[in-house]
Amino acid sequence: MATMLEVAKRAGVSKATVSRVLSGNGYVSQETKDRVFQAVAESGYRPNLLARNLATKKTQTLGLVVTNTLYHGVYFSELLYHVARMTEDKGRQLILADGKHSAEEEREAIQYLLDLRCDAIIIYPRFLSVDEMDEIIENHERPIMVLNRRLRRNASHCVWSDQKASAMMAVEKLIALGHREIAFITGSLDSPTGVERLSGYKDALARGGIALNDSLIVEGRWTPETGAAGVETLRQRRVGYSALVASNDDMAVGAMKQLHQLGVKVPEQVSVVGFDDIALAPFMVPALSSVKVP
């Protein structure tokens, strides 16, 4: 394996000059840079990334923590795509760490990325509380950004959407169109998003003067299968409804398929609304109405 000294000899410069060229630190003439890069290419030299990172205190990496229970959804595929593109545009590499199935495992994933010395970390927490996220941010100097949580003490370190208000808007729109019996398929109720969207549904009904009917509420798990199962549960309960809101587009897709299999026409007999405005939504037949959550 070629060494930096061999590169220096081939380029006719010192090891210090080769180091400056490869690290991008300090002035080196373009002619000298060209000779060094040519020598690197000819020799097949590969710099020691660990040594370079220790010297520059930069790894050119961005860490992302997402629990694997969320990988299956279209929304998270799109999220990962956009994060990867952003990282690529900045000339960096993306490192994905799995938060797995508990707050402790999410902590371990964050620590793993910190140990790798990622320049910055993005976290989409599934189990860690707001207070725990605030504590993690305050105990580390590395830039940490939290998605989909409204932090109490570190507002500049989070990006969040008002999930409750989004659900209220969807239900109020249906009420304005004349719907009174509106079914709701929740997301996982052990997640803040699932709880907030259900709360928005209930508040919209109350504001519209519509009594809450618990028989119209079915718990889902964010997947098309649980969306379809939700429609089947409503059928077995023998409750009527003219509109159905699913807490994400994946469940809405499953619900629409099950309604079709039951011979129910969408939107003529039942209007269906989802959340997240996935790329597939307008290509469905009929097109899926969806709330675009920023």
Language-model segments: residues:
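Short beta-strand segments enriched in small/hydrophobic residues
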Residues: K15-R20, L54-L70, E181-S188
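Bacterial carbohydrate/catabolite-sensing allosteric modules
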Residues: H82-Q93, E108-L114, D131, E138-V146, ...
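Amphipathic helical "hinge" segments at domain boundaries
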Residues: Y45-Y112, R117-D119, K202
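Short beta->alpha connector loops
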Residues: T69, K100-A103, Y124-S129, D250
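Short gly/ser/thr-rich secondary-structure transition/capping motifs
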Residues: E42-N48, E104, P125-R126, M256
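N-terminal helix-turn-helix DNA-binding module of bacterial transcription factors
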Residues: M1-Q60
